[in-house]
Amino acid sequence: MSPAALKNMEENKTTVMTTSHSSNDGGETVKGYSDAVEVRFSDFCKSGLALDENTCTQAIKLFKDTKHLLMTNVSSIGNGTSEEAERFWFAFVSYSVKRLSEKNRDDAQQKSDDPGLTLCQILRLAKLNIVDFFKELPHFIVKAGPILSNIYGADWENRLEAKELQANFVHLSILSRHYKRACRELFLTSDASSDKQPAISNEATHVSDHHRFGWLLFLALRVHAFSRFKDLVTCTNGLVSVLAVLIIHVPVRFRNFSFNDSQWFVRKGDKGVDLLASLCNKYDTSEEVLRKSMETTNNLIANILKKKPHSASEYKNENLVNINPDGLIYYEDLMEESSLQSSLNILEKDYDDAIRNKAELDERVFINEEDSLLGSGSVSAGSLNITGAKRKFDLISSPTKTITSPLSPHRSPASHANGIPGSANSKMAATPVSTAMTTAKWLRTIISPLPSKPSAQLERFLVSCDKDVTNDVIRRAQIILEAIFPSSSLGERCVNGSLQSTNLMDNIWAEQRRLEALKLYYRVLESMCTAEAQILHATNLTSLLTNERFHRCMLACSAELVVATYKTVTMLFPAVLERTGITAFDLSKVIESFIRHEESLPRELRRHLNSLEERLLDSMVWEKGSSLYNSLTVARPALSAEINRLGLLAEPMPSLDAIAMHINFSSGCLPPVPSLQKHETSPGSGQNGDLRSPKRPCTDFRSVLVERNSFTSPVKDRLLGNLKSKLPPPPLQSAFASPTRPNPGGGGETCAETGINVFFTKINKLAAVRINGMIEKLQPSQQHIRENVYRLFQLILSHQTSLFFNRHIDQIILCCFYGVAKISKLNLTFREIIYNYRRQPHCKTLVFRSVFVDWSSARHNGRTGQDHVDIITFYNEIFIPAAKPLLVDVGSAGTTVKASNVPEVGNNKDGQCPASPKVSPFPSLPDMSPKKVSSAHNVYVSPLRSSKMDALISNSSKSYYACVGESTHAYQSPSKDLNAINNRLNGNRKARGTLNLDNDVGLVSDSMVANSLGLQNGNCASTSGAALKSEQSDS
């Protein structure tokens, strides 16, 4: 190890001690620091937050119990200083106590004279912003989780609702931007008669009273009407209804539009502008939905503000000139100066009462111009393009920032960009709101009109089974979807004041979502059955259509797409797994088929499913309670002892009757079907699920947000050949058969062995993509280790599979990088590896900050039990003892040795399952995120690195290619050439020959060219193993 690396290691080792000592004039002992920080927290609670005695006592107790965690993790919290770490810890503890203790109170206690406490108040006192708070909160949850569980019970994480709160913040950030943009477009911030400058010239430095009124009215809708289901689509519809109210009532002198001039106002007949139709056309909602939302908003105004409604058609006012008044309601003086301030005060008080003492986000922060509290990040139009200081926000919110996944197929090239022909605003830059509304339009226009029962074609398949399973399928769908989208019980709370209970709206919402999921389920199931029948050359699909687990996976996938469409805050993944009784491994089997068999699926939902598949494969399938382990015990008996010792096996999947009883389901005229659970429930079947996915250390805290996500099209797959088998897809029924059952086409394999081999192939493919992404961030002189890193990963997956148990595959990849760097004598530190990992779109800081270890499995200086440690400790204590023989093998063999010549490892503890995939060279990969070419923008060309260009183009063929930097005309510059290309692309286009450049099936990547030339991956020299020593990671 280099002297510089040793110095860094020693500096990092002493970070905690140094910061602790320096926190109080440089002379404070550890014990003194501990006592002093406790005193400071006590003052924070009593004087700063003014907590009541009971809550304050609880907070101080929790702080004492977790204080040692603060002191040992100072360097990894915030910027690494003890002062900032303290402020974060103070906020975490006070938020957790307030939130969890509040859940233990009854409503009578909550309605006391307690002034209340919101998250914003906590953060103001701690001098933190919301973005940074959510960025660091997962680390506190992982570290303090066992302590919180002991104090508040096993369900503390569900009651804390931290992920839901974060999702709520992201959605409100998006909605507030959407609302501000609309207000700037429609209204002036000052009287037009005195100031002709529109609001758009003043970058939101001033929020008008009209703007404030609209946002507070929207918050009242969220509190009183939307109840538990504050999904993005419903909220957007509510916001559009608020805009309609503003357009009708804001005095004409504040308007920044004219009904005669504006192109987006729709006229029907000679009665004037149809306002609701115009808003629906602009914001991709439906008139039926908007009218219902308008009715709710109008009732809210009448009940809270005590305003008398008038029919607009019977009321004469200059605000209503040029507007078709049919069906509209007008409130006299609603937004005139004489009553506006009073209305604002009433709405403020109503909101104060609603959030009192709940430690929730004060949603008024988005119009209070408190940028310091919101943080430096913001949502930009089209996507969350974060630059500079704003990049932090991207760590916790990226609704549309996606890359494609190599794990599942793309949609058919014939399908439309969004699954909807001729969707509106196709040339406008997409925003998170417009994307959500377009996706919801797909559900509304393509799925909702379908019948809510099996089609005639599907029914033919159901009847063709050994026995008619139609009633079984219908009953199961009803029960499972009722479990996923439950109706409100009669005993649930009602809203304050004179407004009626929100139960009715909740029930309507749930019923609509159940119907959409049901229709989608039947549609895809029919398509799958048709494809399966073609593969098997038979219409009797008994094995598949009587498989309980398969149907639950299909229902879960359909429901998840509905939830993702509406972006429902209170039903974040893996809620569908928990409510259907399946596991992540089960769901991963159907995602690819689901995408293949629903060609109309919008791009955003395809991305969501691929993002989900990556998340399932990289961590969730490896968690405790995954049915993967049940299959592994059959496919790899040598792993059974370790699996049983760690208690990883999935529990039996709950019966359908048990779920029905749990949700108090009434099946109506359909009798109970005792035969439903005859399949897959025998002891030792190994395919049993768990009603609740076991809790994990919140490694996917950003689950609400769309993560790195990337897949290739069938066209690219055919061109790249080696990424996917050219054989027809295997029958689905073998994927869901009992693990011990022989696979009909598996050459003597059991279904478990076949399933594990397919699964390992996907894991290797995902690893190849991620290894390649990190390699590209390294220096050119370091990139030759790619083959060896990938080879080592494959060997570990095959020979030391237990290293993946309860861990994230990125943790193994990071260790592979460092191990190969050491045996190659490459000057690549763990700090550099982690720095490059941080730059990956799928990066999660918990991957290198918190790695699961089980000390009882080996001799570790007397340490016992299970723990979470940093990546360096895991590498030295667990990874190296297990993987060292494989590292030596990789180092001695080098990349020139063929995969078939890899020697067996002497101490192969896990063994290799029969017919498992051989170690293969690094595959040719498609470009992960090709820049889509839009007809409204210039073409973006990325320079080709000289090293890549030299590998791509040999001397003999160089004359056939034009490279960036070389002019295509005499005395021309590359910039002029690129401008010429842009001018040609963006020039006059004939309507009949519109070029659709939104589909990526026509893009040709460098990797395709490389494959077409038959180029092989470059070889690299590698030397034998060297001493493997510690470094401290940059945490």
Curated annotation (Swiss-Prot):
Alphabetically list the UniProt keywords: Cell cycle, Nucleus, Repressor, Transcription, Transcription regulation
Q: Which SUPFAM superfamilies match?
A: Cyclin-like
User: According to the UniProt record, where is the region Disordered?
Assistant: 403-426, 674-697, 721-748
- Which stretches of sequence are listed as region Spacer? 633-753
Give the superkingdom in one word.
Eukaryota
Localization in the cell: Nucleus
Residue ranges for the region (Domain A) are 431-632
Q: Where is this region: Pocket?
A: 431-885
In terms of InterPro entries, this protein maps to: Cyclin-like_sf, RB_A, RB_B, RB_fam, RB_N
Q: What are the GO MF terms of this UniProt record?
A: RNA polymerase II transcription regulatory region sequence-specific DNA binding
For the biological process aspect of GO, one term held by this record is: regulation of transcription by RNA polymerase II
Using the UniProt annotation, give all residue ranges assigned to the region (Domain B). Answer: 754-885
> What are the GO cellular component annotations?
chromatin; nucleus; transcription regulator complex
Q: What does this protein do?
A: Regulator of biological processes that recruits a histone deacetylase to control gene transcription. May play a role in the entry into mitosis, negatively regulating the cell proliferation. Formation of stable complexes with geminiviridae replication-associated proteins may create a cellular environment which favors viral DNA replication.
Give the protein family: Belongs to the retinoblastoma protein (RB) family.
Task: State the name under which the record lists this protein.
Answer: Retinoblastoma-related protein
Give the species: Populus trichocarpa (Western balsam poplar)
